[in-house]
Curated annotation (Swiss-Prot):
It comes from Cryptococcus neoformans var. grubii serotype A (strain H99 / ATCC 208821 / CBS 10515 / FGSC 9487) (Filobasidiella neoformans var. grubii). Fe cation binds at D120, H122, D148. The lineage of its organism: Eukaryota, Fungi, Dikarya, Basidiomycota, Agaricomycotina. Coiled coil: none annotated. Keywords: Calmodulin-binding, Hydrolase, Iron, Metal-binding, Protein phosphatase, Zinc. Binds 1 Fe(3+) ion per subunit. Its EC number is 3.1.3.16. The gene is CNA1. It catalyses: O-phospho-L-seryl-[protein] + H2O = L-seryl-[protein] + phosphate; O-phospho-L-threonyl-[protein] + H2O = L-threonyl-[protein] + phosphate. Calcium-dependent, calmodulin-stimulated protein phosphatase. This subunit may have a role in the calmodulin activation of calcineurin. This is Serine/threonine-protein phosphatase 2B catalytic subunit A1.
Length: 639
């Protein structure tokens, strides 16, 4: 058995011998792709893709040559299409002037036909451009948008600035309603606040929030159709109820304003097995499901033909519900204008064109858009865990520079000057120190590996379908293999169902106050024409999920005998009754980008386990390596 001094000398000799290896020269200006193609690293790989706009516009570019008080619409359209940004002053000007126009409008708009009605946009700017191709040029087409311009998509601020600019140019023909996502609570929980802070500043975000509070809540189209974002409320009897709302504030979590932003038709709308008009909305975690009877009674009471709303993704881009018995017209219509929602729903989008008492649905498919790393992460931050893992792999390789056989070789050329340890206890202590150092390096390698895995999963939307049939991270991951696991619209919808709930209160590490409504002050494919209805007997599917946590604070109860929205809680399909108070939340979502906070805590917990040696996935090979190097007397016995 070779002595420790001999083994040390052998290791040094092995390192010296390997230091003479010639390092091959590498041309870093060229890179070979997986298909064998050689590309230049100093040029754009895909030359036919236009480079992003790397500058902010000058005042001469920004202002219109026709009217110096308004932005140049054509320039903005192209500039945003190239991912360009404005100066903060230019963005704030658009939000201020657009907000003033919105504030001057009533809660309930009255708009005439012909008109094009559009549903949710959700930050899909490139699809918004396609929408205008399908629906018509805003310069000569009347438009009504039903809300949800922001969140989920990564181009929300471009959608807002462009639509607000159009409002400045066409205040009498382009109308914007408020959706449930136009509030501080949801924009902080999802992506819009993060996007504003990344692309502009929190000042721009706050200006957006103030402007959102000016958005009208509803519209009557052609004196026949009520257009709202969500649905009906037990507090909504006549249209005058809408006119009396104080809309210049953050949406409450109960009451009429909440319901018209959050309510949905019942899942089995038109074939209900209940006599109730309103049932607790367990999918949203607040507001109500309204029934066919509730819709028919409201329409008859207000002499209207139908309710046009958005708020729910639709596979075909739209849905017509059961017809009323008196008019034979669909009682409710849902329009959704974000194609291939979240890049995985594979749904079509649609707009509703109403002209000369003829209603046509125009469908369109998604448009390719630039890719963003999760949560607007830069490539250096994204790649750091990968680099760290490789560095620790190199360090471990250095420690394992020679084999056990090389360590055991006897060679008279190396003098044995080092004294043999005489104290067995001291030798054991030294061996333990060496072993601990090697294991520490191994744990650091595990930490970097863990960080890399967590980076890969930052944007992943975890499936919580009881069967776990769908892999975690399918809805926001760019990996094609993960996307292929989703078979269709319903798979995507069921996996994303938790994100349809009213989020819990969350506290930003940079802020002292929770981002909740109560914390915010009150502030003053080729398109084709298709049949205008589809079979209304196909139910909307929606499976309630197990609640994750309770986090919503209680709101103010309604006055005695006044119907109030049950914000959250209770068993599914609980009928409203007088005095039905607000309860705590049954639901939250683990899957939005705001979970960066909770994901970070989880990652730190895992790292502590690894560093503390509690990680069950420890490297057995590293353990054996540490044992061999630190215990030379056992080297011949181990593998």
């Amino acid at each position: 058995m070779a002595s420790p001094a001999t083994q040390t000398a052998n290791a040094i000799a092995a390192i010296n011998n390997r230091s003479n290896l010639v390092i091959p020269e590498i041309d870093f200006t060229q890179h070979q792709l997986e298909n064998g193609e050689i590309v230049s690293t100093t040029e754009r790989v895909i030359k036919d893709v236009q480079a992003p706009a790397m500058y902010v516009p000058t005042d001469d570019q920004f202002w219109s040559k026709v009217d110096k008080t308004k932005p140049d619409i054509a320039f903005l359209k192209n500039h945003f299409y190239r991912e360009g940004r404005l100066t903060e002053e230019q963005a704030l000007y658009i939000l201020e002037k657009g907000g003033e126009l919105l504030r001057s409008e009533p809660n309930l708009l009255e708009v005439d036909a012909p008109i094009t009605v559009c549903g949710d946009i959700h930050g899909q700017y490139y699809d918004l451009m396609k929408l205008f191709e399908v629906g018509g040029n805003p310069a000569d087409t009347r438009y009504l948008f039903l809300g949800d311009y922001v969140d989920r998509g990564y181009f929300s601020i471009e959608c807002v600035l462009y639509l607000w600019s159009l409002k400045m140019w066409y205040p009498d023909t382009l109308f914007l309603l408020r959706g449930n996502h136009e509030c501080r609570h949801l924009t902080d929980y999802f992506t819009f606040k993060l996007e504003c802070k990344h692309k502009y500043s929190e000042t721009v975000y706050n200006a957006c929030m103030e402007s959102f509070c000016n958005l009208p809540l509803a519209a009557v189209m052609n004196k026949q159709f009520l257009c709202i974002h969500g649905g009906l409320s037990p507090e909504l009897h006549t249209l005058d109820d809408l006119r009396s709302i104080n809309r210049f504030r953050e949406p409450p979590t109960q009451g009429l304003m909440c319901d018209i932003l959050w309510a949905d038709p019942l899942e089995d709308f038109g074939s209900e097995k209940t006599n109730e008009n309103f049932l607790h909305n367990h999918v949203r975690g607040c507001s109500y499901f309204f029934t066919y009877n509730a819709a028919c009674q409201f329409l008859e009471r207000n002499n209207l033909l139908s309710i046009i709303r958005a708020h729910e993704a639709q596979d075909a881009g739209y849905r017509m519900y059961r017809k009323t018995k008196t008019t034979g017209f669909p009682s409710v219509m849902t329009i959704f204008s974000a194609p291939n929602y979240l890049d995985v729903y594979s749904n079509k989008a649609a707009v509703l064109k109403y002209e000369s008492n003829v209603m046509n649905i125009r469908q369109f498919n998604c448009t390719p858009h630039p890719y963003w790393l999760p949560n607007f992460m830069d490539v250096f931050t994204w790649s750091l865990p990968f680099v760290g893992e490789k560095i620790t792999d190199m360090l471990i390789a250095i420690l394992n520079c020679c084999t056990k056989e090389e360590l055991e070789e006897e060679d008279e050329e190396f003098p044995l000057n080092a004294p043999e340890p005489t104290d067995a206890e001291s030798a054991a202590e030294r061996r333990q120190i060496i072993k601990n150092k090697i294991l520490a390096v191994g744990r650091m390698s595990r930490v970097f590996s863990l960080l890399r895995e967590e980076s890969e999963r930052v944007s992943e939307l975890k499936s919580i379908s009881g069967s776990n049939a769908l892999p975690a991270g399918m809805l926001a991951s760019g990996a094609e293999g993960i996307k292929e696991a989703i078979q269709g619209f319903e798979d995507a919808r069921k996996s994303d169902i938790e994100n349809e709930r009213l989020p819990p209160d969350i506290i930003d590490p940079d802020e002292d106050k929770p981002a909740s409504p109560s914390a915010s002050p009150i502030m003053p494919a080729t398109p084709e024409e298709i049949p205008s209805e589809i079979p209304y007997d196909s139910p909307i599917t929606g499976t309630p999920r197990t609640p994750i946590s309770s986090a919503i604070a209680s709101g103010s109860p309604g006055s005695p005998g006044t119907p109030t929205s049950p914000s959250i809680g209770g068993p599914p399909l609980t009928a409203w009754r007088p005095g039905h108070g607000r309860r705590t939340s049954l639901g939250t979502t683990k899957t939005s980008p705001s979970t960066r906070r909770r994901s970070l805590e989880n990652t730190m917990h895992l790292i502590r386990d690894v560093v503390g040696g509690k990680d069950a996935q420890g490297d057995g090979q590293l353990e054996r390596l540490a044992e061999v190097i630190s215990s030379p007397t056992k080297g011949g016995q181990g593998e």
